[in-house]
Amino acid sequence: MATKKKALKKSKLRHAEYYDFQKIQDKLYAESMDGKMFTKLVEIITLPENIKLAYRNIKKNKGSKTAGTDGKTIQHLEKLSEEKLVVLVQRKFSWYVPQSVRRVEIPKDNGKTRPLGIPTIMDRLVQQCVLQVLEPICEAKFHDHSYGFRPNRSQQHAISQVHKNMQLSHLHYVVDIDIKGFFDNVSHGKLLKQLWTLGICDKKLISIISAMLKAEVAGIGFPEKGTPQGGIISPLLSNIVLNELDWWLASQWENIPTQYPFKQTPNRNGSPNHGNKYASLRRSGLKEITCVRYADDFKIFTSSYPNAVKLFHATKDWLKERLGLDISCLLYTSPSPRD
């Protein structure tokens, strides 16, 4: 499975290079790192090369053969020439009104079901066009402790970081938090504000994303909250919502200024190495904490049981006050049964 995912990521990169869109994505990432406020993103989203790239990526996805409420699949788009497809998608963006979403129930291991919302193939293509432009902008603002549904990150990377936290940093106390019905309870208004905070200030694009969120679910109606699982853009939107949590948790220890001097050295890949800073922070006597998040599943690591309890209550209150989300269950993990 991991090999297939790596191959898919490599194929997407090759597609971007083939359509000469990788340079645009790199530019968006660099500008986002510099704090640019993007006001004309729809112009980039509707570029022919972005639309062609989106179609190529959609076509390679096995879900492209799954029909939405209109009964159409990728085979219906294959009949169109590239020129006609580009014009069709550009017209769609000029006044975007999504079609209804087909709802299906997917069985889970515990005997329950997980609802999926399947947009029409054309709406999936529109979402892919948006994703390819938003993703590099958001990647520049996402925290390193987030691993789910991100380029060049995987479950294996998250597991490796968990082992590092417990074995090398000796943070044996873990607060394992499960958000109650996360995908069904995301506030649309809060999410749109978070997009703006990340520098996505194109009002037309914000309106389009709002329309995606409020698309009618066949047989149920128009949702007032939530990001339906099954949509191509939903994983990115969920990371945008919880990115605020990542940075808040980081502010509780690792981003605190330290009075002890330290030398900043880069890793081999050029990314910053925080080891010296963390060593300096440990000298300060502050209670060390860190976290690992994969989508809506996140674990907070610390060095003592009392601190774990404090972190749980602080995180629970923060999620409720800032994001309007509740916790459904909690598990404390300690190094021995006595603890």
Language-model features: where?
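Residues forming anionic-ligand binding surfaces in small-molecule and nucleic-acid pockets
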Residues: P107-N110
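Short alpha-helical scaffolding segments that buttress acidic/His motifs in well-ordered protein cores
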Residues: A54-Y55, C129, I208-L213
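Duplex nucleic acid-engaging cores and interfaces of nucleic-acid transaction enzymes
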Residues: I121-L131, E139-F142, Y173
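Active/ligand-binding-proximal structured segments within catalytic/core domains
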Residues: V126-L134, L237-V241
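Non-catalytic, polymerase-adjacent accessory regions of viral genome-replication enzymes
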Residues: M1-E83
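Conserved small/polar residues in nucleotide/adenosyl-binding loops
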Residues: Y332-D339
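Conserved polymerase palm-domain catalytic core
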Residues: F93, S100, K141-H145, F149-R150, ...
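Amphipathic alpha-helical blocks
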Residues: H76-P98
